């Protein structure tokens, strides 16, 4: 987390000046979940669109039309134009460069490598790559337009707004969360993240959980005693599991752990690119 200023306040990342301290973005579960969602959904829509144009143009892949072409990847009978690999590279570059602007040169390098590899492997010709790149960028633009208006830029609030959230919780419930650091940080990370546009859930109220037990109530005390018992008798296995999920520096945060599980299952079950994209999107 960013270090405090001399006056005890805390700086926030600025997407308009991502290289200024603290660097933008400051990766945390809400931001990571949003990035994964846009990236995966864009890939999925891009592949659906690719299949539409593959069978509209229905141009055979070059290696199927010319038996003299040597290939270095498994063959298939799909139409070659536009290249699905080029589409994935282009749409991924577009979305990830917007989400992680300080990494855009590295991301561009990887996208170029991906697209070149398809030609080096004999799977695509230049026009397949060009068509796929154009399609991927077009789909990426649609998703970037959504991201620009989804309300995320208002999720991180200035101190007066975060203080008002704290005061509202105190007035309504009789308690509020307090940061234990010195100097004290404002209320939470992106406290208005709940206002960001939802993907499929109609509204947050439709999935609202029951309220938590009040501090010092019997239910609260039972839960606190259980937690203290765990802490007093923590096993090595429990500690290892807790560290895995701890969302520390250098991790891809809890949302990324689940993407990792999904990718491992995709490989294990030998899913094709369409099914893999669908898994990650949903």
Language model feature labels by segment:
Residues 1-282:
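Acidic/polar surface patches and capping/hinge elements
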């Amino acid at each position: 987390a960013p270090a405090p200023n001399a006056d005890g306040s805390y700086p926030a990342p600025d997407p308009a000046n991502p290289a200024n301290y603290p660097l933008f973005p400051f990766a945390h579960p809400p931001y990571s979940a949003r990035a994964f969602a846009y990236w995966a959904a864009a890939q999925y829509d891009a592949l659906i669109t690719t299949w539409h144009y593959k069978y509209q143009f229905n141009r055979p892949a070059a290696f199927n039309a010319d038996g003299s072409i040597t290939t270095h990847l498994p063959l298939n009978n799909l139409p070659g134009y536009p290249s699905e690999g080029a589409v994935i590279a282009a749409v991924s570059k577009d979305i990830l460069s917007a989400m992680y602007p300080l990494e855009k040169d590295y991301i561009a390098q990887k996208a170029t490598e991906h697209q070149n590899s398809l030609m080096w492997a004999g799977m695509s010709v230049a026009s397949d790559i060009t068509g796929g790149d154009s399609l991927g960028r077009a789909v990426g633009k649609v998703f970037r337009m959504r991201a620009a208006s989804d309300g995320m830029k208002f999720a991180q609030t200035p101190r007066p707004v975060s203080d008002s959230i704290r005061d509202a919780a105190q007035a309504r419930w009789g308690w509020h969360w307090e940061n234990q650091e010195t100097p004290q940080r404002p209320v939470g990370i992106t406290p208005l993240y709940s206002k960001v546009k939802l993907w499929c859930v109609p509204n947050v109220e439709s999935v609202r959980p029951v309220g938590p037990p009040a501090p010092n109530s019997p239910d609260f005390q039972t839960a606190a005693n259980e937690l203290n018992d765990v802490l007093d008798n923590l096993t090595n296995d429990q500690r290892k599991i807790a560290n895995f999920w701890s969302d520390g520096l250098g991790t891809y945060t809890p949302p990324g752990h689940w993407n990792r599980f999904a990718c491992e299952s995709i490989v294990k079950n030998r899913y094709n690119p369409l099914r893999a994209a669908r898994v990650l999107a949903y």
